[in-house]
Swiss-Prot record:
Gene that produces this protein: rph
Protein name per its UniProtKB record: Ribonuclease PH
SUPFAM superfamilies to which the protein is assigned, alphabetical: Ribonuclease PH domain 2-like, Ribosomal protein S5 domain 2-like
NCBIfam families per the UniProt record, alphabetical: RNasePH
A GO molecular-function descriptor: tRNA binding
Residues where phosphate binds: R86, G124, T125, R126
Record-listed E.C. numbers: 2.7.7.56
Key words of the record: Nucleotidyltransferase, RNA-binding, rRNA processing, Transferase, tRNA processing, tRNA-binding
Any Pfam family the entry gives: RNase_PH
Species annotation: Enterobacter sp. (strain 638)
Length: 238
């Protein structure tokens, strides 16, 4: 029995509260159980220097955790004077994932920055960030269309992510912290709404996993992501 009482293939309750802040073009408070992340999408005209004159847009991301998002306080990275390796890895993952959701040529020369700030962490902060940021991005793009700055929606479809892992020999979907901290295998999977893989990050923390276990985990992830995408689409209809 999992601590939450969930079945092995069941994701935590996922909520997506849109328009959570008033200034950003897109803003979403996403919750995967007790993991909560504020995701905002900000639009700027123009693109980075390496893309100028190419007629395409850019999507980038920043990620951070509030000092008391975890059990004990962590100093702000700004106070340390630099970002940690984990932070840089996660924000690059978020950006890569969301670029897969958009036709950058159709976007044109706009830059959209996705800021993901973890308010409370209970496992799966990067997967929650990707899921919430995708909805914030969709809202931001709709505002560009409403303002007459885009004729066509560059969004190709939803992108979502979930963690999977092996805990005490059992493959589980959407690990909370108490499961993640003892997992023999920990994996994050990002997919499009039609089940195509954008990224797989998998590590054997204890015991190496087999090819068959990998396929089991990917199947679990796909089922979880299908459920999450349904929630994303429902949120965008409200």
């Amino acid at each position: 029995m999992r601590p939450s009482g969930r079945s092995a293939n069941q994701v935590r309750p996922v909520t997506l509260t849109r328009n959570y802040t008033k200034h950003a073009e897109g803003s979403v408070l996403v919750a995967f159980g007790d993991t909560k992340v504020l995701c905002t999408a900000s639009i700027e005209e123009g693109v980075p220097r390496f893309l100028k004159g190419q007629g395409q847009g850019w999507i980038t991301a920043e990620y951070g955790m509030l000092p008391r998002a975890t059990h004990t306080r962590n100093a702000r990275e700004a106070a340390k004077g630099k970002q940690g390796g984990r932070t840089m890895e996660i924000q690059r993952l978020i950006a890569r994932a969301l670029r897969a959701a958009v036709d950058l040529k159709v976007l044109g020369e706009f830059t959209i920055t996705l800021d993901c700030d973890v308010i409370q962490a209970d496992g799966g902060t990067r997967t929650a960030s990707i899921t919430g940021a995708c909805v914030a991005l969709a809202d931001a793009l709709n505002k560009l269309i409403a303002a007459g700055k885009l004729k066509k929606n560059p969004m190709k479809g939803m992108v979502a992510a979930v963690s999977v892992g092996i805990v005490n020999g059992e493959a589980l979907c959407d690990l909370e912290y108490v499961e993640d901290s003892v997992a023999e295998t920990d994996m994050n999977v990002v997919m499009t709404e039609d089940g195509r893989i954008i990224e797989v990050q998998g590590t054997a923390e204890g015991e190496p996993f087999t090819h068959e276990e990998l396929l089991t985990l990917l199947a679990l992830a796909r089922g979880g992501i299908e459920s999450i995408v349904t929630t994303q689409k429902a949120a965008l209809q409200n």
